[in-house]
Regions:
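Acidic/His- and Gly-rich active-site-bordering loop/insert found
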Residues: 2-111
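Conserved small/polar residues in nucleotide/adenosyl-binding loops
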Residues: 113-115
Length: 115
């Protein structure tokens, strides 16, 4: 497969994942289990190992995952950290904030730049 095809595939997969992520209504304080399940599934397909921690009510979940470097045991690890809750929807949206919308080569949706 050519580099151009690989780049296009990576771009399309990234847009698909971002589009899916925007669709999860994980407003602060609400259940985020479905989103964590989705992220865990993607990471496991990439070879990650993971574990979860829960709040007292078992509706807010933290996901910790480890993905080892490919082709080398000498590569240094990196840590990515983020959060899954979003702010409540405010006024002023011209489209559904939980539906990814592309306008003029820009992707819009609640939480896209929130991490």
């Amino acid at each position: 497969m050519s580099t151009e095809n690989n780049s296009e595939l990576l771009y399309n997969n990234s847009i698909k994942i971002l589009t899916d992520l925007i669709g999860f209504k994980t407003i602060s304080g609400e259940d985020n289990t479905a989103l964590i399940d989705y992220c865990d599934d993607i990471l496991k397909k990439l070879g990650a190992t993971s574990f979860r921690t829960y709040d007292v009510e078992k509706k807010r979940v933290n996901l910790f995952a480890t993905l080892k470097a490919r082709n080398s045991n000498n590569k240094k690890p990196i840590i990515l950290s983020g959060h899954t809750d979003v702010v409540p929807v405010s006024k002023g949206w011209s489209s559904d904030p939980f539906t990814a919308t592309i306008r003029e080569d820009k992707l819009y949706g609640l939480s896209l730049i929130h991490i």
